[in-house]
Every structure is written in C-alpha cells, then in structure tokens.
Amino acid sequence: MTKLIIHLVSDSSVQTAKYTANSALAQFTSVKPKLYHWPMIRNLELLNEVLSKIEYKHGIVLYTIADQELRKTLTKFCYELKIPCISVIGKIIKEMSVFSGIEIEKEQNYNYKFDKTYFDTLNAIDYAIRHDDGQMLNELLEADIILIGPSRTSKTPTSVFLAYNGLKAANIPYVYNCPFPDFIEKDIDQLVVGLVINPNRLIEIREARLNLLQINENKSYTDFNIVQKECLEVRKICDQRNWPVIDVSTRSIEETAALIMRIYYNRKNKYNK
C-alpha cells in the first residue's frame, strides 16, 4: 500500500475538502491515506501553525479559504516546498463569476448565514428523530420520504442523512406476522422506498446487535426463514404499489441516501413539468 498524506485546510469545518478528498481517494484502491484536518483557520497566526505541520509532514494540501491573503500565503508556502496545493472550490467560483459576469466578493463574512436552507435542515432532523421506527404515524403526510423495511436495514441512519440534506424522512419497520400501518392502503403523494438486504447479511447484523445488548432469547429475530420472509414481504408490498426497492446489502448509508435522493428529485422534477 502506498502511503499518502493529505492536509485539509479550511476557514470552516473542512467537510467540503474532506468529502472531495474521500471521493478522489475512492479511485485508488492501493493507497493508504492519512488525512490531517485543520479547521477554522481564519488568521495568519493559525495558518502559520498549520504551515509548520505541513512542513514537518509533506503531503498534498486541499484547502477552502476565502481570505485572499491567507490563500496567497498558503499557496506560496506550498510552492516553495514543491508540494501540491489545490483549491477545492476555487475553479468553481471563478467559472461562476465569469459566466454570470458578477465579481467575486473580496470581503469574507464569517457569521453563519441562518437562511431558509439552514432552518429546513433543522426541521428535517427534528422530523426524522420524532418519526423514527414507526413513531407518530398520524403525521406521515408531512414527510417527503417514507422508508420501510425489516429491522436493521439502515432505515434510521439513512433517514438522518436525508434530513441533513433538508428532506423530511420517516421510517417504519416491517416485522413478520405483525400488521403493517394502514397507510399502505391509501393513495399518498409521499415517496415510499423499501429497503431490503441479503438475509444472511441481515442475520449477521442482528446477531451482532443482540450480542452487544447481551440478549440471547430472541431466536425469531435471527431465524433465517423469518428474516427471508420479512425481506420478501417488503418487496411484495412495494411491487404491488410500484414503490422502489433498494438492496442495501453492499451499499453504504451515503450511497443508499444518494439513490433515494435521485429517485425523489427525478420524481419531483417530473411532477413539476
């Protein structure tokens, strides 16, 4: 494995640089990365501290810094060390300015912008928490997305991930031989997505969960036939109503959420035409 050091430097949380780095690293299976996070770098004193760390451990520098003087100092330093220094969104900002004819604002305001998007995200997170695991079914019509699936198919973390993207997601577990909420018999506008998983993989996850909780008596929870029937029944429910089904066996939460968002926005764009 080839070791690769990456310094993420930002005047905010470094999340943009981090996501970009991880997306790029996914293309290199033989690389063993070491990421150093340097958030909230907003003055020369803090930047100089980071520069000393970079000098000690050479590596690629990815940055998102708005202040022009700090950017110049960082790029000049890296140039002298002969190490790559890449602005994550600099090219995007420049192209936006050229295309729109609007000059880039020189002054950076570090006060967070509490706009509609911010409050929509907060509301979506609150909604996901209150409507987790089949709670408050009387408010399902407020949801953007409803997830259904057997227990431990990543419904909760997927709901939260969707919430961080401003989408209200409720999730409802399907349990074998238990009545499902009557909302499935109604013609609803919300996007309903079924989550299923390979039964053997689901049993592994459930067994690990039971061991963590030190529970040894719930045999039906890990019974192959029951687990298989739960997944098949969810598929059947969704197929009968033309609801999409996603197999999460080999997907990360981010991938599952991205697929759901693609379905949601394709559907929304279609209805808005």
Curated annotation (Swiss-Prot):
Nucleotidyltransferase recorded as keyword: no
What Enzyme Commission number(s) does the record list for this chain?
2.7.11.32, 2.7.4.27
UniProt key word Transferase:
yes
User: Which reaction equations make up its catalytic activity?
Assistant: N(tele)-phospho-L-histidyl/L-threonyl-[pyruvate, phosphate dikinase] + ADP = N(tele)-phospho-L-histidyl/O-phospho-L-threonyl-[pyruvate, phosphate dikinase] + AMP + H(+); N(tele)-phospho-L-histidyl/O-phospho-L-threonyl-[pyruvate, phosphate dikinase] + phosphate + H(+) = N(tele)-phospho-L-histidyl/L-threonyl-[pyruvate, phosphate dikinase] + diphosphate
Q: What does this protein do?
A: Bifunctional serine/threonine kinase and phosphorylase involved in the regulation of the pyruvate, phosphate dikinase (PPDK) by catalyzing its phosphorylation/dephosphorylation.
Stated family:
Belongs to the pyruvate, phosphate/water dikinase regulatory protein family. PDRP subfamily.
Q: What is this protein called?
A: Putative pyruvate, phosphate dikinase regulatory protein
